Amino acid sequence: PDLYARTYKFLEPKDYLNLKLTGKFASAQDAIALHWVTDNRDLNRVYYHPALIKASGVDQKKLPDLYSSTDVLGAILPEAARDLGISADCKVVLGTPDVQSAAIGSGAVDDFAAHLYIGTSSWLTCHVPFKKTSPEYNMATIPSAIPGRYLIGNEHETAGYCLTYLRDKVFYPKDAITPEGAPPDAYQRFNDLAASVPAGSEKLIFTPWLIGERTPVEDHTIRGGFFNMSLSTTRAHMVRAVFEGVAYNSRWLLEAVEDFAGRKIKALNIIGGGARSDLWCQIHADILNCEVRQVKDAVQANVRGVGLLAGVSLGKFRFKDISSRVAIQKSYQPNPAHRKIYDELYAEFKNVYQAHKDIHKRMNKTH
């Protein structure tokens, strides 16, 4: 209560930085959306909704004024320019949060053009010209940085983190067997191991729900595991199964996004740390049965996105020009030879969830 009473404004991290740069308290409609205090059903008139403000318990006077992500907030303060060593003539654009900036940096900015992010977590989304909520899939549209457009909001809790878990808790923990811990090239070794195993990992299935799942099912008690292990299962099989299990989960989400959007997605741009693996890109193309376009400098998609947003805001180019400004390093087509095994195992992947969800609910009911 004391902290609340002493607080003048509640700001998102980027909005605090903008305050230091310009002296202005401001937030963008897309950034404030996940505070659940705005009515964004009409993107031309986003405002703090009285009922939502009341439910939040926060005084509206403690919230910043609302703008568009593309608005120029103003010139940088002289002291900020001096501290940063940049020109005092620099303009400060309001900017956009993590997911929205990645969407722009992926180059998938047209309506229904999709991108897949594989990092610690993952998501698969596209811009759409409508607002919609799906309790079935635990998905809803959120305002994007592009005026008049929404993004389909969803998330997988653990994607690339499954490999981190494998590295730090299974293969290379600092214990009596591997006291030195993981080598610097651990992920490349994983990639090489996975490539040595045929598609389908000899029918070993990994489910990546290490801390539950959000979409296309909201289930905080489900947990991950390896299924169908045998005496012939090697750690190479386990590594490839992790690559494939994350991709099965991506396909599950893709199907939900397609149903939500009302159309098939035939190609998607892939970004994030996982996109640096050629093998993982190909596995995704095979399992999702669609073209996967590996964005160049995929890890920098978020930074590129805010840079491109600034370019639009300052009139250097238009949103429709962005896709041609984002380079595609390589395109991956589905391998028809892998279609049968991956379709079979994907069906069983979903069956594993149905067969085990009640068991996990009982086992993890206190979590």
Each predicted region: which residue ranges?
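Glycine/Thr-rich phosphate-binding loops that ligate phosphate moieties of nucleotide
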Residues: 2-7, 11, 126-367
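Conserved glycosyltransferase catalytic-site signature
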Residues: 14-15, 96-101, 121, 284, ...
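Short glycine-aspartate micro-motif
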Residues: 10, 89-105, 113-117, 123-124, ...
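Short acidic loop-to-helix transition motifs that present clustered carboxylates
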Residues: 68-75, 97-101, 275-277, 300-302
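Short, acidic/turn-prone active-site loops that include or flank metal/cofactor-
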Residues: 32, 120-122, 296-300
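Gly/Ser/Thr-rich active-site cleft segment
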Residues: 1-97, 163, 207-211, 239, ...
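Short acidic, glycine/serine/threonine-rich loops at helix termini
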Residues: 21-26, 31, 40, 76-79, ...
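Glycine-rich beta-strand-to-loop/alpha-helix junction loops that act as flexible
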Residues: 69-70, 118-121, 267-275
